[in-house]
Amino acid sequence: MTDVSPLIDAMGLAPHPEGGHYRRTWTAPTHVDTPRGSRHSASAIIFLLDRDEEARWHLVHSDELWIWSGPGALEVHLGGSGDAPEADPRIVTLGSPAKTQASDASNPVQILVPAGT
């Protein structure tokens, strides 16, 4: 693991419940009623995983747009409907063409993770 403590401090990040660190950067002023109660209709966060960290597998209850801006690439595993992924999840590799090797230039830099996956 690299020492990302200076970056965490500089960006004002806090531990995220699913692993890594984050900071909420925007919250919509409108609310929607959900089975889990009233929630903001949208929000945005900065999310940081160190090189050797993984986010805990979890079911997302709302659509999530992941935008990758780090060096190298990030694998996002999709598929499953509960506490564990499917046996053969769909893997999408996100990578910034400007910051990865030429062979990675075809990788997208964002993905929509649909609610319920």
Task: Pin down the residues of each PLM region.
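Non-catalytic, conserved peripheral segments adjacent to functional cores
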Residues: 1-111
